[in-house]
């Protein structure tokens, strides 16, 4: 568990650290003070692209991750959207992709619990969410390590399945 004020200050520190700006997969980083979250636009990994072609027979355009705070669980909450590349009558476009087996596609079966949600404070848009119910057990919430809670959370909930490589 991380108190909201601590989350807010650690989110700013995380953004300022440039960890996402320097990530090879990251195309764009946007800190949203109004909605109290961090939006990332990512290039799909080769493995994710291969899984998508094999499972869904589709080509990926990009991935969106949104880091926000769950006031119900008092934990960070990771939201995810996957966009596919399409061509209709020769006109390229991107379309939101809603795979039926998201865990297999992301190769996170048994590691995280994902669900499809409508997020009201994000214009009622549809996102997959990594359920935060076991977060404190996974990340560890001892008081002496609270100052690094969000960094540890990011390494587990994002970098563990997407990998991290400097650009």
Swiss-Prot record:
Compartment(s) where it occurs, according to its Swiss-Prot or TrEMBL record: Preautophagosomal structure membrane
Keyword terms: Autophagy, Membrane, Protein transport, Transferase, Transport, Ubl conjugation pathway
Active site residues according to the UniProt entry: 133 (glycyl thioester intermediate)
UniProt cross-references to InterPro entries, sorted A to Z: Atg10, Atg3/Atg10
Enzyme Commission code: 2.3.2.-
GO BP term (any one): protein transport
Single GO MF annotation: Atg12 transferase activity
Membrane topology: Peripheral membrane protein
An annotated GO cellular component: phagophore assembly site membrane
Function (record text): E2-like enzyme required for the cytoplasm to vacuole transport (Cvt), autophagy and nucleophagy. Acts as an E2-like enzyme that catalyzes the conjugation of ATG12 to ATG5. ATG12 conjugation to ATG5 is required for proper localization of ATG8 to the preautophagosomal structure (PAS). Likely serves as an ATG5-recognition molecule.
Subunit text: Forms homooligomers. Interacts with ATG7 and ATG12.
Family: Belongs to the ATG10 family.
Name assigned to this protein: Ubiquitin-like-conjugating enzyme ATG10
Provenance organism: Saccharomyces cerevisiae (strain YJM789)
Gene (UniProt): ATG10
